Amino acid sequence: MAGAARGLLWAALSLCLLPEPLRAAHIKKAEAAAAGGGGGVGGELRYLHAAELGQALRDLVAEAPPGLARLFSIGRSVEGRPLWVLRLTAGLPELPEARQDGEKKKKEEEEEEEEEEGEEGGGGALPGRPQVKLVGNMHGDEPLARPLLLRLAQELVRGWAGGDERLGRLLNTTDLYLLPSLNPDGFERAREGDCGGGGGGGGEGGGEPGGRENSRGRDLNRSFPDQFGSAQPDLEPVPEVRALIAWMRRNKFLLSGNLHGGSVVASYPYDDSPTHRPTGVYSKSADDEVFKYLAKAYASHHPIMRTGKPNCPGEEGETFQDGITNGAQWYDVEGGMQDYNYVWANCFEITLELSCCKYPPTSELQQEWENNRESLLTFIEKVHIGVKGFVRDAITGAGLENATIVVAGIAHNITAGKFGDYHRLLVPGTYNVTAVVMGYAPVTKENIEVKEADATVVDFSLQPTVVAPDPNLTQFTATPAPPSTLTPSVAQVEPPATTSLHQAVQPVDFRHHHFSDMEIFLRRYANEYPSITRLYSVGKSVELRELYVMEISDNPGIHEAGEPEFKYIGNMHGNEVVGRELLLNLIEYLCKNFGTDPEVTDLVQSTRIHIMPSMNPDGYEKSQEGDRGGTVGRNNSNNYDLNRNFPDQFFQVTDPPQPETLAVMSWLKTYPFVLSANLHGGSLVVNYPFDDDEQGIAIYSKSPDDAVFQQLALSYSKENKKMYQGSPCKDLYPTEYFPHGITNGAQWYNVPGGMQDWNYLNTNCFEVTIELGCVKYPKAEELPKYWEQNRRSLLQFIKQVHRGIWGFVLDATDGRGILNATISVADINHPVTTYKDGDYWRLLVQGTYKVTASARGYDPVTKTVEVDSKGGVQVNFTLSRTDAKVEEGKVPVLNTPDTSDPNEKEFETLIKDLSAENGLERLLLASSGKVSPYRYRPYKDLSEFLRGLYLNYPHITNLTSLGQSVEFRQIWSLEISNKPNHSEPEEPKIRFVAGIHGNAPVGTELLLALAEFLCMNYKKNSAVTKLIDRTRIVIVPSLNPDGREIAQERGCTSKLGHANAHGRDLDTDFTSNYSWYSGTREPETKAIIENLILKQDFSLSVALDGGSLLVTYPFDKPAQTVENKETLKHLASVYANNHPLMHLGQPGCPNKSDENIPGGVIRGSEWHSHLGSMKDFSVTFGHCPEITVYTSCCYFPSAGQLPGLWADHRKSLLSMLVEVHKGVHGFVQDKSGKAISKATIVLNEGLRVYTKEGGYFHVLLAPGLHNINAIADGYQQKHMKVLVRHDAPSSVFIVFDMENRIFGLPRELVVTVAGASMSALVLTACIIWCVCSIKSNRHKDGFPTLRQHHDDYEDEIRMMSTGSKKSLLSHEFQDETDTEEETLYSSKH
C-alpha cells in the first residue's frame, strides 16, 4: 500500500512538472482511455483489427508517463499494414522535435502511421540495458498474442506509474519491445473460433484457408535463412520477414519469445536438423542448457504447460516432459525464426505455444491472460541471468563495440553493443570468459561463478596491440555486420567474415611423455574441457597398458548424423615418438583454442576427431631418447611389428594377431571413420596405398582411388616446406627423392600386413602413412621445431575429410536412413557404405562423377555429381523398395504405428537409444554395483548362488528345476521378470543357456554375472528396470552339471567333461523326430526339451559354448534348407558386432591362427556340422531362433581371465535383451474384436509362428521389408508387408474377415451352382413324372398304339446292312409295348 501511494504521488508530481499543454493532453488521453473500455486497454480483452490495434497502442503511449513508451513501425505487410512495435523502458530520451502542442497530435499520429522506422527507429539503445522482444501473430490465424501483449503493455505501464515494485524494476532495467502482430494481413482473413487452422469456425478447420500465411501464401515461420537449408530463401514475397531481419540487425536483442497457438508447450532450438527428418531428431544447439532453462522458466509458471499434457483435441496422448520440447524432436521446421535469431543475431529465442485452440473465442481471453501473465513476466526477467559488463579500451576507457565474448566450452559467441556493453545468458555454473577485439590483446577471466540470481558483473579492459593484421585469420562471431540497406538481399543474410588480430594459443608442453605422464596429460585435458572431449580406451597392450583415444568434438560421445569422423594414430612403432608428441600438442592446441580461434572452432564443430597418441605404449617404454635409426622398442612386447600384423590382400600373414592390432581393428569397425593418418618416423614423406603388391617387389601399386590418395598426401606435404622439397634425409639416404614429398607405398618399399591398406580395403576409411622426420627419437629440446613444421599440416589434413561428396540415403517409404546402403562411383572400384542414419562420406577429387546408391530390397538410384576444388558437395538419395511399384495399392506396407500410450512411446525410445552408438556403453556406465566374476563355481556353489539371487530378489526372480542329470544334479532355471512365473503373452521371452558341454564353463559364469547384474540394477538403473519390466528372461546356466564337475581348469583343449555321465555329447542328442524318440534320450536332453524348449514359448535363445570366438546360427545339420537365414544371421551379427574382437572374424585360436570367419558369424554346418543339435531342434520344433556363442578359444581358461571375458561379452549379452524387442509383434482378431489364438503367421512364405492366447504374436526378423500371410480356419487369408527397422520394433494389427470360399471356390459361385443344381434336379423330377404319367394313360386305353411306318424304315436298314451273319442276329424284334408280359425276345450279350 505504501509503495502504491508513493507511486501515485510520484505520478502526480510528474504530471505537475510537465509543461501545461502536455499535461493537459496527457490527462485528457488517460481519461479517454479509461472511458473507452472496449479498446482492449482498460476493459475486457478482445481482438482488435489493424486500425483499432494501432489506435489502442497510440492511446497507451499517450497514457504512459514521459520517457516510458514509444510506438513505431518496423515496416509494412504485403497489403501495406504497419508492423507496430511498442517499446517500453524507463528513461527513453526524447525524439528530435518533440511534440509540444497537443492540438498537433492528430496530424502527427497520422504521419507516424505512414512512416517506417529509420536508422534509429524507436530510439537509440541504452547502455547496459538488455533488449528483449516478444513477437506475436506470426501465423495470422494464431492471434492470441495480440490481446495478450496489449494487456501486458497496459499492466507494465500502469504498474510502473503506480509504483509496483516488480514491474518498476523490470522496466527500469529492461528494454522491452512488443510486436503484437507480424502477420496483420493473415489475421484479417482468420476467423474467431477456428481452433484447427483450416478457416472454419468452431474448431472444425473447414472452409477457405484461415490466414496462416501472408497475403502471398508464404508461411513466415518457414521463410528465414536456415543453417541446414540447401539454398537461401527468396525473401521478396515476405516483406514482413525482411523488415524483421533488418530490425534485428539494427539492434542487439538478447532474449526473445515467439508466441504461437495450436498446442501448449515451450519449444527451443534447434527447430530442424541436417537430416530434416519429420520428427524425433533432437537437434542440440551449443546453448542447449540455457534454452531448456528459459523454456522451463515459462512453462513452470503456466498451469497447463507445466503438466506436460496439453490434452489438445486429436492429440490427447501427446506429452512433453516439463512442458518443453526441442523443436526438431517435436517436428522439423526448416526456415524458422527462432533458429535464425540464435544462429545469426545473438538473440536467444524460444517458441511459445499458448493454447490448443489457434484462435480462441473472445470469451476465453481473460482465462488465457491469467494462464500466461506470470509466465510472460518471469520469462522477461530471465534476460538478467548469466554474466554482463563492459569491454573497454584500457587506455582511453572507451567502450569497444562488437567485441566478441567467448565462453570456453560453448561454441556460440555473442558481440558487445554500441557502448561496449555485453550480456551473455548462462545457467548457474563456473565459466571462463574471453573478450576478443581486433587490434587488442584478448583477455580471459577464469572461474567466473554464475548464480541463479542476477547476472555476475565482469568487465574487461583490453590493451591495444600493434601487430599487423593476418589475412588468414577471421574473427569468430555469430553476429553479422550491420547491412547498408534496410532490406537485405539474399547475400546479405550470410554473416560476412571480418579480419581479426586474434592469435591462436600455441602448446607449451614440449617434453617426452612416458606412459604415466601421458595418461595424466590426457586425463587433465579431458577433465578441463569436458564439453568438447571424451577420453576412452580401445583395449590394452600386451603389458596391459591402455590404448587411449582422445575424442574432440562439440558433442563428445555422440555420432552426429552427417558429421564425418577422423582419426590420427601415433607411435605404432614404439621408438618413433614424434607422432606421439605431436598428437599430444594437437590435443592441447584444439582444446585451448576452441571457441576463440575460428579455424579450430570450425574443425571441432564440423568434425568428430579421434586421436590415439600411442598404439604401442609397451615399445615406447623400451625405446631410448636420441635413437636416430635403431629398432629397440620398434616392436611390441611380443616382438612383433604391428605394421606387419594386419591381414593383407596379397600375402598370408602368419604371425599371430597381437592385442594392439586386434584392438585397433575392432575400433575401426566400430566407428564410421572417413579419413586417417598413421604417424611414423625415420624419413620425411607421406606415403599412400597400396603398401605392397602381388610380386613383393618395389613397384607402383595403384589403388582404385590413387588420385584421391595423391591429393590427400599433398594436402599434408604442401604445408611442410621441408617435406615438400622431396629430399628429406640426405645424410642417411643421399639418393632418396620424393617428388613433392609424397610416394606410393609399394614403390618405396613393400610392406605386407600394413595398417593403411587394411583401412582402405576393410572399412570406409582412407589412410595414409606420414613419416615425420629423419630421427626416430629426437631430443626433447627439438620437439618445438617439429610442432612448428607440422602444425599447419596436421590441421590442413583434418580438413580433407570434408572433400568429395557426402549426404544421406533415405527410404522413400518413411524417410528414414538406410543402414549399409552402398555408394558406388562409376569407374572407381571402391564402394563405401552408409552408417546408422543413412549418412555417408565419399572422398573424391575435383571432377564429374556418376554416383549410384543401392541397397538390398531397393531400386538403385544414380546421379551425376559435379565436385569442385573448394569442398564437399551434399548429395542425398531416396530409394524406393524393389517391389513397391508391383504391389502399389494392393498390399499394405506397415511400419510401427504411433501409439498414444506414453509408456509405450517411452519404451520404444529406450530401445532406439540403446540401439544407437554407445547406447549400451551409456547403460553400463550408469549401472550401479560392480559385477565381475573372479572364480568358477562348482555345482554346489552354483546352486547356492542361484538360491541367493532368488531369496534376495524374490519380487523379480523365480528359481525352478527343469529336471535332473544322470547323476541326479538339478538343472536350474532362473526366471527374471517383474512378474515371475506369471504368463504375459505380449512380453517377449528370451532364454540364455550354457554348459551343454561341461568342459566349457565360461558361459555358465557369464550368465551368473548377467543375472546378478540385472538383479542389482533393478529399480536403480532406469534402462535395466524397463527391460526387466518388459521382458521375460530365463537363464539356465548349466545344462550338463555332471560334465562340469569333472572338467579341469586351464584345460584349453581337454575334452574331459565334454559329454554327460553316460558319455553322450548332449548337443547330438536333440534328434529331429522327437515324437517317436523316447527310450534312449538322455535325462538332461529330455528335461530341456519337455520343460524348456517345448513347454515355454520363446522369441529368442542364446546358447553359450567354448572353443573359439565366433557365433553360429542354424542349422548344424548339413544340407538343411534355412528358411529365415537372413534373420538368423542378423541375430548372430548383433552379438558379434557388440563384442570388441569377435566381429573381426579372426578368432586366432591355436592350430587355427589362419582361420577367417567374416564378421565373426558362420552357419553351424559350415563350421562344425553334426546331427541332433539343440539349436536345430529349437528352430524346428520350438519355433524359436537360437544362436550359439563360442566365448573363447580356450574351453576352460584360468579364473583370472573371467573379468576380462565378462567385460568383452556383457555388452553383447545385453544387446540380446534389446534385440528381442525388435522384429514384428502384433495382434490378430476378427471384426467383432474377438482375439484369434493359434492363427498361423507365415513370414516370407516360409517361417511359421502361431498366435498365443489373446491373439498375440511376436517374431524376430532382419531389418528390411517382409511379407506376412495370416491364416486361420473360417477366415479369409490376410496378406501384407511390414517394414522392420534395425533400431525399433514394428507393430501390426490384423483383423480377419469371415471366410468367403467353400471348397476353395468363392461363396457366391458355390451358392449359384448349388441353386442351379437344385433347380435342375427339380426340373428332372418333373419331366420323369410327366413321362410316367403319359405311359400310364396309354395302358388305360387297352392296346398300345403302334408306330406307323417305323417298321418299314427299320426293315430297310436291316436289309441294307452288309455285316457278318451275326449281325443278322443282333437285331431284336421291338414291340411298342412296355409291359413284361408282351416281351417275346430278349437279347443276350
Curated annotation (Swiss-Prot):
Binding site for Zn(2+) 1: 139, 142, 260
Gene3D superfamilies named among the record's database cross-references: Carboxypeptidase-like, regulatory domain, Zn peptidases
Enzyme class: hydrolase
Cytoplasmic-facing ranges: 1330-1389
Pfam families: CarboxypepD_reg (PF13620), Peptidase_M14 (PF00246)
Outcome, altering residue 353 to Q: Loss of catalytic activity in carboxypeptidase domain 1. Total loss of catalytic activity
Biased composition regions of type Basic and acidic residues, renumbered to the chain: 96-108, 210-221, 619-628
GO biological process, one term: protein processing
Xref: InterPro entries: CarboxyPept-like_regulatory, M14_CPD_II, M14_CPD_III, Peptidase_M14, Peptidase_M14_domain
Extracellular side, ranges: 26-1308
Domain of life: Eukaryota
Subcellular location: Cell membrane
Protein EC: 3.4.17.22
Spans annotated as Disordered: 95-133, 188-235, 614-639, 1367-1389
Keyword Transmembrane helix in record: yes
Domain observations: There are 3 carboxypeptidase domains. Only the first two domains have any catalytic activity. The first domain preferentially cleaves C-terminal Arg residues, whereas the second preferentially cleaves C-terminal Lys residues. The third domain binds to pre-S, hepatitis B virus large envelope protein.
Complex formation: Binds to pre-S, hepatitis B virus large envelope protein, via the carboxypeptidase-like domain.
Protein name: Carboxypeptidase D
Species name: Anas platyrhynchos (Mallard)
